[in-house]
Each structure stands twice: as C-alpha cells, then as structure tokens.
Amino acid sequence: MKRYRTLLFDVDDTILDFQAAEALALRLLFEDQNIPLTNDMKAQYKTINQGLWRAFEEGKMTRDEVVNTRFSALLKEYGYEADGALLEQKYRRFLEEGHQLIDGAFDLISNLQQQFDLYIVTNGVSHTQYKRLRDSGLFPFFKDIFVSEDTGFQKPMKEYFNYVFERIPQFSAEHTLIIGDSLTADIKGGQLAGLDTCWMNPDMKPNVPEIIPTYEIRKLEELYHILNIENTVSC
C-alpha cells in the first residue's frame, strides 16, 4: 500500500459540518430581516449559491461577486429588494459561529498529526475559515492553512496547488493525498496537480466518468485503512 507523508484536507463537509453551519446562519439571517424562510427558499438558495461558487471555481467570478450577490439574487426572486453586500456581512457573522465537526474528525485529525504533515486547502473566506477551525479545536493540528482568498487562486486551478506546493517543505506529489467532498474542486483539482485523491462521499452521490478518485470513503474513519495505520481511539 502506498505510503503518504503529506495530507491535504478540505474543510467544509470534509472535517467541519458546513451544512449545519449554513442552516443556522440562514435561519438567523432571515430572522434578523423579519423575512419568513421557507423550505422553497432554502432550496433555491442552495441552487443559486452552488451555481455561483461553481462559476468561481471556473474563474468566471470573483469571490466578492459570489458572496455579495447571492442574497440579493435570491430575495429578488421572491419580490424583495435587498442590499446583497450588507446581508453578506450579517450572514458571515452568523456563519463564523458554525464549527460543528464531522463525526470522527477530531479524533482522526489529532491521531494523524502525530504521523503525517497535515495542511488545510479550502476555497472560501479567510477570516471565516480561520475562526471556525480555531473554534473547532482543529487549528493546532495543521502545519499551514491555505485559503483561496489568501492565495489569489482557487481549487481546482493548478495555480492554487502550485502556490500550496511551493510552501510545503520537501514537498513530494507522489507522497501526498488530498481529501475532500467536492469532485470538481478537490478531486479534479488534485488530479490536475498530480496527486492521489480521496473523495469524502457520505451521501453516496453518483460519480462522473471523467473524475475518478483514487479512493472513495463514506466516513472519515475509513482513512485509517487507506493510510495503513491503527485507529488508536477505537482500540
């Protein structure tokens, strides 16, 4: 079995539960605005938000364009006029409080950092990601954190990964594994950068033929087998 030395972890829905953080932040934002948040609006927000972030991954939009237009675009569909940038500021404050861990994340990361060099690779807003990682207790386990906002590039762009590789001492692509939940950002990005990839896929989403991960897992504990190490927590 291949021996890895460096592990690159995505954040949202890989080690931190972004779905829970997002749901809470949306509820608090709409309560603040005195606007009823319906299930239809939640679903439409996800559609709009995912589409905008996909455009960001493809280099078609900036991060500021994504976050400052998503709420105004959503509310316009329901007859509301809104200041998208102002709503984003309020939403961001609520979102930063969401640091619920994915099941098994703390034990896994605290174990792995004893044997591997761990790094964060994430698309998003720097202040938000740093705060959530600190509040979750995971921050000290990582040697460095690479947020797209700080690098000037984003996953899956090769320039993003080049930026990361240049800042990892004695970096070796052959001995590096990236773990993430996004086929387009993490898995495709890892492949373009010459890395082995591990797709975190708890919901058993269908794959696409052109993006085949090296490994696929349903829960984080499965990484112990891939990395050929003992799960000291369960023993």
Swiss-Prot record:
Coiled coil: none
Active-site positions on this chain: 10 (nucleophile)
Gene Ontology annotations of biological process type: pyrimidine ribonucleotide catabolic process
Gene Ontology molecular function terms on file: 5'-nucleotidase activity
UniProt keyword Glycosyltransferase, yes or no: no
Enzymatic class: hydrolase
Domain of life: Bacteria
EC number: 3.-.-.-
Pfam families cross-referenced by the UniProt entry: Hydrolase
Keywords of this entry: Hydrolase
Cysteine disulfide partners in this protein: none
Record NCBIfam families: HAD-SF-IA-v1 (TIGR01549), YjjG_YfnB (TIGR02254)
PANTHER family: PTHR47478, PYRIMIDINE 5'-NUCLEOTIDASE YJJG
Similarity comment: family membership: Belongs to the HAD-like hydrolase superfamily. YjjG family.
Name recorded for this polypeptide: Putative HAD-hydrolase YfnB
Organism: Bacillus subtilis (strain 168)
Lineage of producing organism: Bacteria, Bacillati, Bacillota, Bacilli, Bacillales
